[in-house]
Amino acid sequence: MRKIIHVDMDCYFAAVEMRDFPEYRGKPLAVGGSRERRGVISTCNYEARRFGVRSAMATAYAQKLCPDLILVPGRMQVYKDVSSQIRAIFSRYTELIEPLSLDEAYLDVSDCKLHKGSATLIAEAIRRDILAETGLTASAGVAPVKFLAKVASDLNKPNGQYVIPPDKVPEFIRTLSLRQIPGVGKVTAEKLSSLGLNTCGDVQTYPKQELITRFGKFGAVLIERAQGIDDRGLSVSRERKSVGVETTLAQDIYTLEQCQQVMPGLIQELSTRLSRSAKDRQIHKQVVKLKFSDFKQTTIEHRSNDVSVMMFYELLAQAIARQDGRGIRLLGVAVGLSDKSLISEVDPLQTQLVLSI
């Protein structure tokens, strides 16, 4: 039986700001873009959450909910540096670490001999080390499978942990809301609820073939999760799958011509990022993303081993066709990266954007 820990830092970006600037403590604080630049909230502290402020919320709306909200732009390099400290703490206990972001990770401590091999005690030790060495609190979930460890890490926040022993999984899973399963979003949860499926126990008694017919591969995965099954190992090597750049516009724009004026700057920055961080990786697709004034978004992609600037403009035209009269608040471009490195025979121009095309 595996021993999986999911560690999740508590309101990470905001916590770093409160650590470094004590005057923010006890006051509603958010890290994000300004309302003048039509930004969104990256994260916020618990004082702000009491007003209904949430991550990914438009800054303007967050400030309506909480007029006294303190907004700071964020210091990404500081967050990365602290994340490296935390990663070093993890490595004292196991080499099997799957980082999900700067502030959360899975750890497989099945073979760890420290603290008598107890995953519960190991999680407690990791959280103590993080607090002592970074001044930040972390929450943790402990379970025999990944998705339950992630669910558990949310159950005793902040600065706590929750353990689901193997023999308690059937009892725990039976009443678990489907909305708590990672990957089940609001729309999917509503579709499941319309079928009378609200808990894992409901799924356990529902005809399996009907679920698979209705939901395909997701239905098959849901059946497993509803029984507490998750055979996924940790992805210890997590090479980035894409490189992209996007911009939130100061004002909504509405026409293809206006979007085309934004593209050269995005493409130039994408070229810079590719040459800096993915120059030896094979490209397999190009992507254009639009976010509209109602915060819904669309992406158009084209699969190819070659990168063409003109293709970005063609994808943009296809994306604009989905506009339906809405304003455009965000525009982005990206390329998908394959797992393979480029071989020497491949034209090096395939790894960069040729801006003269």
UniProtKB/Swiss-Prot annotation:
Top-level taxon in the UniProt lineage: Bacteria
> Its principal location?
cytoplasm
Family matches, as CDD domains: PolY_Pol_IV_kappa
Active-site feature positions: 104
Co-factor note (free text)? Binds 2 magnesium ions per subunit.
Site positions for Substrate discrimination:
13
| Pfam families from the UniProt entry | IMS, IMS_C, IMS_HHH_1
The cross-references to Gene3D superfamilies, in alphabetical order and at most eight, read: 3.30.70.270, 3.40.1170.60, 5' to 3' exonuclease, C-terminal subdomain (1.10.150.20), DNA polymerase, Y-family, little finger domain (3.30.1490.100)
Cite the GO molecular-function annotations of the record: damaged DNA binding; DNA-directed DNA polymerase activity; magnesium ion binding
**GO CC list:** cytoplasm
Question: What keywords tag this UniProt record?
Answer: Cytoplasm, DNA damage, DNA repair, DNA replication, DNA-binding, DNA-directed DNA polymerase, Magnesium, Metal-binding, Mutator protein, Nucleotidyltransferase, Transferase
* Enzyme Commission designation: 2.7.7.7
Q: Where in the cell is it found?
A: Cytoplasm
Q: Which InterPro entries match?
A: DNA/RNA_pol_sf, DNA_pol_Y-fam_lit_finger_sf, DNA_pol_Y-fam_little_finger, DNA_polymerase-Y, DNApol_IV, IMS_HHH_1, Rev_trsase/Diguanyl_cyclase, UmuC
State the family it belongs to.
Belongs to the DNA polymerase type-Y family.
What is said about its interaction partners and assembly?
Monomer.
Family matches, as HAMAP family = DNApol_IV (MF_01113)
Q: What is this protein called?
A: DNA polymerase IV
Organism of derivation: Shewanella oneidensis (strain ATCC 700550 / JCM 31522 / CIP 106686 / LMG 19005 / NCIMB 14063 / MR-1)
